[in-house]
Amino acid sequence: NGILYMQVLQRDTKVSGKGSDDNRSYLLALEPKTGKQLWKTYRPAKARSESLEAFSTPIPYSHDGRDEIVIVGGDCLTGHDPKTGSELWRWGTWNPSRITHWRLVPSPVAGNGVILACGPKRAPVFAIKAGAKGDVSSESKSVAWNSEGSRDGVTSDVSTPLFYRDNFYVLYGEGRDKM
């Protein structure tokens, strides 16, 4: 639709190898031809230190007639209205003990009514049901499935999964697995 969406980790004037607790990330929409800012939405997070950081990319996703931008980072996965940036839903339960060194690399991927998000550092892969509203972190019904307890603990610390021909593919460890 001619709009560029990006996640930005805003740092204060201090620069360090680790994030600091006052970093604020946001999702930004720009008009590509002019660079004009269309909207900016801050993404509050309970994450601390390095766990605030993410190298993920926002993804557009449409399900049951609802368009949204999905992004992961700061120990949470969120869906946003692409026209306004407002947060539609939030899920974040893969780091309940608030480990501080869980920087996230893989981007989410979506298909068949679920949004796949990989936790960092060998944490499980989670499939969150599309169409959520509000904070669904405590709702077990919002999770379609996860890889906890699966053979070899399927996870992806760096590679973004692939949705292809109605299947999700996750590259992990020494091999590959189709979920």
Question: Where are the language model's segments positioned?
Answer:
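Noncatalytic, solvent-exposed loop/strand surfaces
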Residues: N1-M179
